[in-house]
Swiss-Prot record:
GO terms for molecular function: glutathione transferase activity. Glutathione binds at S9, H50, T51, I52, E64, S65, R66. One of its GO terms (biological process) is glutathione metabolic process. Pfam families: GST_C, GST_N. Keywords: Detoxification, Transferase. Homodimer. This is Glutathione S-transferase D4. It comes from Drosophila melanogaster. Residues 86-207 form the GST C-terminal domain. The lineage of its organism: Eukaryota, Metazoa, Ecdysozoa, Arthropoda, Hexapoda. Its EC number is 2.5.1.18.
Length: 215
């Protein structure tokens, strides 16, 4: 299956880890967004929203990383451990995935991402949203080893991708002890972590370059 991605993208890194957990091989096609490769006609035919990641599986194109993750585990999972069939367990996983998209990852994009692109951080209100997102996640993880239930699921993998992104921009995760505990364990047990970190190092290079340019 063809996988259009950027190694710096948290959504792309999520899918790389999910595929690793499932034992799937992805035919990776890196798109250079800064060079407009996502706007080429052949890619727009696959994804008119021209977003990454995008997966094409036997002619079926799907984008939005959390939708891709769920598709992969439902179609290719040897069991339902990453996305249980039980309606309540599945609902909790979906809630965490939506939390990641709409709250946690969104707070990164509004506060830190502008700095990586332009050297200008978001405003103080946006930073408060980062703190609030981690406070919520810390509550979710009180007395829990995983973000949604008693085992590793796609929600852990997606949130691991997001939380690790905050690490490379020097956000102090240690202020949230439950998150820090979960994060240390998730890095050890999640398949594909090394490739996730490899992609993050590219983002870290961009972040450090922006910091240096402001000195």
């Amino acid at each position: 299956m063809d996988f259009y991605y950027s190694p710096r993208s948290s959504g792309s890194r999520t899918i790389i880890m999910v595929a690793k957990a499932l034992g799937l091989e992805l035919n990776k096609k890196q798109l250079r967004i800064t060079e407009g490769e996502h706007l080429k006609p052949e890619f727009l035919k696959l994804n008119p929203q021209h977003t990454i990641p995008t997966l094409v599986d036997n002619g079926f194109a799907i984008w939005e990383s959390r939708a891709i993750a769920v598709y992969l585990v439902e179609k290719y999972g040897k069991d339902d451990s990453l996305f249980p069939n039980d309606p309540q367990k599945r609902a909790l996983i979906n809630q965490r995935l939506y939390f990641d998209m709409g709250t946690l990852h969104d707070s990164f994009m509004k506060y830190y991402y502008p700095f990586i692109r332009t050297g200008q951080l978001g405003n103080a209100e946006n930073y408060k949203k980062v703190e609030a997102a981690f406070e919520f996640l810390d509550i979710f993880l009180e007395g829990q080893d995983y973000v949604a239930g008693s085992q590793l699921t796609v929600a852990d993998i997606a949130i691991l991708s997001s939380v690790s992104t905050f690490e490379v921009v020097e956000f102090d995760i240690s202020k949230y002890p439950n998150v820090a505990r979960w994060y240390a364990n998730a890095k050890k047990i999640t398949p594909g972590w090394d490739e996730n970190w490899k992609g993050l190092l590219q983002m870290k290079t961009m972040y450090e370059a922006q910091k240096a340019s402001l000195k």
